[in-house]
């Protein structure tokens, strides 16, 4: 079994150093159920775990996941169709800048690009590592983060990708920008990097890693799985054990935000400029409409208590979509994200 094919591998790779053997035992059954046999051929299905979603317009959207799965909707998420991708590698992240131009990244340095929203072609990666998140700020300028604290960049729509930044030998899980200059990248051990010049320079703002001289135990910051940027001053990051942090001063100070949620794993986050923040994870989904002062659990039909939410995207200024375990696609009902959410019937 190749556990690297499991969606949890991409989200929690490296967590054993701080979670320990007990946590890994709890995750074994999930890894086994999600594992794939190396080189095995498999027909793509509509119920593959989905790890990421992107809506460049209110109607047009794409989601990606295991076995090279890419789904497309042209009606705001009501119906979805599979798109051929030419790969069986797990696709961890997808992002579209408009209904034609999109990118998906994942296992073994996989980078896919479409210029018509229909057909996908491979782009050459300068590294063979796992690529965790892709974000484009224009149809030509984009970023990818992944293993070994690598940040890749392109200024020609992915015709050429270059290593823009690398630091410690950790995994960056996510990258997000609010414009073509201001962005953050986050990852293992609470590492946070910030740019205010479009990636020309990346500066570390938080994170630490050490090994105790007395016990030889690994010590480090809380793992961060996702970051969402509101404006040049404001950003949110989420991670292990229900950890949520926010900055309102461009990252000079990151403060923990209490949500009263159980210590579950928060894998994804999304936000808008109206003060709405959404957080999803292991059987958990939280929404704040007042910039984090209060948090509520929206009603899901069916309930997601036993499910996993891996990706959230905004599909309009007030409407959102979430994806996750077993091909789950959830849409917020109406203009208020606190209203009931429903799962799309595939």
Question: Predicted segments — roles?
Answer:
Residues 14-17, 25, 77, 336:
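N-terminal processing/targeting junctions
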Residues 1-15:
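N-terminal secretory signal peptides that target proteins for export/translocation
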Residues 34-346:
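Residue-level hotspots at or immediately adjacent to binding/recognition sites across diverse folds
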Residues 20-30:
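Bacterial N-terminal signal peptides
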């Amino acid at each position: 079994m190749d556990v690297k094919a499991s969606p949890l591998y991409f989200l929690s790779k490296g967590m054993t150093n701080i979670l320990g053997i007990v946590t890994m035992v709890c995750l074994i059954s999930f890894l086994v159920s999600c594992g794939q046999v190396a080189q095995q051929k498999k027909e793509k299905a509509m119920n593959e775990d989905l790890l990421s979603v992107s809506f460049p317009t209110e109607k047009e959207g794409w989601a990606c996941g295991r076995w090279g799965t890419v789904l497309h909707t042209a009606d705001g998420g009501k119906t979805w169709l599979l798109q051929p991708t030419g790969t069986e590698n797990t696709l961890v992240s997808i992002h579209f800048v408009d209904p034609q131009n999109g990118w998906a990244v994942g296992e073994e340095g996989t980078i896919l690009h479409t210029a018509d929203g229909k057909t996908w072609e491979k782009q050459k990666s300068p590294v063979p590592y796992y690529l965790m998140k892709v974000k484009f700020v224009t149809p030509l300028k984009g970023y990818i983060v992944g293993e070994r604290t690598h940040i890749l960049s392109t200024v020609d729509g992915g015709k050429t990708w270059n290593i823009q930044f690398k630091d410690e030998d950790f995994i960056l899980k996510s990258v997000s920008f609010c414009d073509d200059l201001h962005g953050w990248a986050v990852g293992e051990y609470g590492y946070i990097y910030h740019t205010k010049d479009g990636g020309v320079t990346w500066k570390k703002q938080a994170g630490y890693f050490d090994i105790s001289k007395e016990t030889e135990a690994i010590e480090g910051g809380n793992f961060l799985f996702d970051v969402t940027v509101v404006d040049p001053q404001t950003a949110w990051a989420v991670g292990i054990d229900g950890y949520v942090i926010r900055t309102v001063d461009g990252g000079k100070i990151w403060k923990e935000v209490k949500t009263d949620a159980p210590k579950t794993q928060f894998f994804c986050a999304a936000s808008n400029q109206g003060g709405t923040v959404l957080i999803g994870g292991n059987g958990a989904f939280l929404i704040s409409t007042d910039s984090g002062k209060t948090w509520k659990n929206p009603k899901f039909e069916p309930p997601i208590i036993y499910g996993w939410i891996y990706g959230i995207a905004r599909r309009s200024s007030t409407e959102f979509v979430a994806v996750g375990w077993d091909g789950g696609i959830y849409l917020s009902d109406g203009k208020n994200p606190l209203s009931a959410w429903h799962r799309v019937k595939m």
